[in-house]
């Protein structure tokens, strides 16, 4: 299987040329958002437009926000790249900047999705004539609200809507004056869930192939995206009480307001009745291979890491990362996908799990 779903082609429907001409007529710099269901050719359209606009002398930027099927590495981020030469796949582009989402589906992460696209759009506008924004295929249910929030935040000058049967109408209502509806190419290919997973596996593997283990002192960096270090550490009396009540061995515990959050190992088998409004717990066995974002002071992601271990007593965190220059890391942000460096995904965590 090829490592990318979308490649450059000139064999496109006639309306693509009309889209190029419309973009050409827009006041610059201009933002163009591309929306559509899964497997409607959004990324193929993005690649075509970028190459065509480059040929016409425009400076082009691409924002890849399809976090589960990224062309611009790595997955679980929104990425910005500037196009300086003709290319055939988003894989050919080198990212200029990223925004960390930390998972491969927008569910539970609407805020991050909107903020990420907005921040990268603002950055891209400083250095380009046209910003092309490729989006996820989440267009139904809560996906309608996500797309509308993105439109409200980014304020695109043009929306290109790849549509089969008017399925984008709930998203586009009120934005008809800035929308061009495009037909879905007959050549658009459907990908199964297993094919998508295999594509992602290869991208994870490629991203982490030259990684090394580094250690961070938790006193030197901000840790976010988790309750692990919020509130105050529980005392020995509280720890012993919780261990007796629930037959746990508590590795780490915090009191956050009136609630407890603990990392635990079961000391014995059997059911436990735990009021999660009072005590939230996380299994120590899962506190590894969690995706981490390495974040700079501006809130951008300089690269990813994989959590290998945490020494709570010594306040050390062991991270596998391909990032060589770590001097600008001000924050480590926890994601919600567990993945190994060979690309094997171990599952998604609920946002509230950590």
From Swiss-Prot:
Cofactor annotation: a divalent metal cation
A Pfam family recorded for this sequence? CLP1_P
EC top class, as a word: transferase
Coiled-coil portions:
none
Q: What is its EC number?
A: 2.7.1.78
**InterPro entries assigned:** Clp1/Grc3, CLP1_P, P-loop_NTPase
Keyword field: ATP-binding, Kinase, Nucleotide-binding, Transferase
Q: Which SUPFAM superfamilies match?
A: P-loop containing nucleoside triphosphate hydrolases
Q: Which residues bind ATP?
A: 36-43
Superkingdom of source:
Archaea
Q: Please list the GO terms describing molecular function.
A: ATP binding; ATP-dependent polydeoxyribonucleotide 5'-hydroxyl-kinase activity; ATP-dependent polyribonucleotide 5'-hydroxyl-kinase activity
- Which Gene Ontology BP terms does the record give? RNA processing
Q: Which catalysed reactions does the entry list for this protein?
A: a 5'-end dephospho-2'-deoxyribonucleoside-DNA + ATP = a 5'-end 5'-phospho-2'-deoxyribonucleoside-DNA + ADP + H(+); a 5'-end dephospho-ribonucleoside-RNA + ATP = a 5'-end 5'-phospho-ribonucleoside-RNA + ADP + H(+)
Describe its function.
Answer: Polynucleotide kinase that can phosphorylate the 5'-hydroxyl groups of both single-stranded RNA (ssRNA) and single-stranded DNA (ssDNA). Exhibits a strong preference for ssRNA.
Q: What is this protein called?
A: Polyribonucleotide 5'-hydroxyl-kinase PYRAB01840
């Amino acid at each position: 299987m090829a490592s990318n779903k979308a490649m450059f082609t000139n064999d496109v429907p006639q309306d693509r040329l009309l889209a190029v001409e419309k973009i050409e007529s827009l006041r610059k710099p201009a933002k163009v958002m591309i929306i559509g269901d899964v497997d409607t050719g959004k990324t193929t359209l993005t690649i075509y437009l970028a190459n065509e606009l480059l040929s016409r002398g425009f400076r082009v930027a691409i924002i890849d926000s399809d976090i589960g099927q990224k062309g611009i590495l790595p997955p679980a981020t929104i990425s910005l790249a500037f196009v300086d030469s003709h290319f055939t796949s988003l894989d050919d582009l080198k990212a200029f900047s990223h925004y960390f989402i930390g998972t491969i589906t927008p569910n539970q992460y609407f805020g991050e999705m909107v903020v990420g696209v907005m921040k990268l759009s603002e950055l891209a506008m400083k250095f380009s004539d046209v910003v092309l924004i490729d989006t996820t295929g989440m267009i139904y249910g809560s996906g309608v609200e996500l797309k509308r929030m993105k439109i409200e935040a980014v304020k695109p000058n043009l929306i290109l809507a790849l549509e089969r049967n008017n399925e984008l109408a709930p998203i586009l209502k009120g934005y008809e004056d800035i929308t061009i509806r495009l037909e879905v190419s007959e050549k658009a290919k459907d990908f199964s869930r297993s094919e998508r997973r295999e594509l992602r596996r290869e991208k994870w593997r490629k991203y982490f192939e030259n990684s090394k283990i580094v250690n961070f002192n938790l006193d030197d960096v901000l840790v976010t995206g988790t309750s692990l270090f919020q509130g105050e550490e529980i005392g020995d009396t509280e720890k012993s009480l919780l261990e007796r009540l629930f037959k746990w061995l508590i590795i780490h515990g915090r009191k956050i307001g009136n609630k407890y959050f603990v990392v635990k190992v079961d000391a014995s088998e059997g059911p436990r009745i735990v009021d999660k409004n009072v005590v939230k717990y996380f299994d120590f066995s899962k506190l590894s291979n969690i995706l981490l974002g390495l974040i700079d002071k501006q809130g951008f992601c300089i690269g990813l890491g994989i959590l290998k271990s945490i020494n709570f007593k010594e306040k050390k965190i062991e991270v596998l990362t391909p990032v060589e220059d770590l001097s600008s890391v001000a924050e480590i942000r926890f994601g919600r996908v567990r993945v190994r460096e060979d690309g094997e995904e171990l599952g998604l965590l609920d946002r509230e799990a950590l």
